[in-house]
Amino acid sequence: FGVPMTPETSAIALVYFVQGVIGLASLAKSFFLKDELHLSPAEAAVVMSISSLPWLVKPLWGFISDTVPLFGYKRKSYLCLMGVVGCVAWSTLSQGVSVVDNRWTASFLFAVGSLSIAFSDVLIDSIVVERARESEDNSTTGSLQSLCWGMVAFGGIASSYFSGELVEEKGSAFVFACTAVFPLLIAGAAFLVKEERKDFSTSSEMVANVVVSGGEREEEKNVSVVEAGKETLSTLWSVVKQKQIWGPALFMCLWQATPSPG
């Protein structure tokens, strides 16, 4: 892909691979809801809709990681946490109807599983953007993007190839158990990410480190979590007010709202 395979680059590739291969459970979810929980198509659709909610509020996860550091890190600690959370959710689902015996429990666990991937997606995207800004070579930025999407595609193809046979031969519980392994790869990848640990705590309050842009100059300052949140919201609002993003935003909205055969 034209990108030096440093430990951090390997971590980025691994997280994107997990985003693709996590689709291994897609078919198993449908079979579990219809064949084991005996839900109607309408009820199953509601459960699947609830499970997709974490993807609809992705900006919220970015806002949280930027303003509320965890154990001195904004990226690594959340990546590790989401990996563990996802593993727990899928492991619980692998216990079958003996534990997950109603649609609400299934909805919650599917949503938590989606949260682990959606949150990780936001975190790894921010890391890719940061590395792209640090690089002076535009070709490296393009190669990094190619690597990311290539790993997602590879993971998706692999999961599509094996998912049907695994569900048929082993059942949905086995597939959920296999899926539980993949979030742990995200947790492991977190330790390969380069991020300097910072002491965000003072004697009286937790503080966050934010970047303040001023023309072509950027500087960092330590502020309270509340002030960091206000700073981030102010920055987001200044971006939303720019008319040049309205067109692309409208296109994305219409694209997502339009029915598709997939």
Where are these regions (language model features)?
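Helix-loop boundary and gating motifs at the non-cytosolic
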Residues: 1-55, 246-251, 255-262
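Residue-level hotspots within transmembrane alpha-helices of multi-pass secondary transporters
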Residues: 28, 59-63, 161, 188
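Intracellular loop-helix junctions on the cytosolic face of multi-pass helical membrane proteins
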Residues: 1-6, 88, 94-107, 119-122, ...
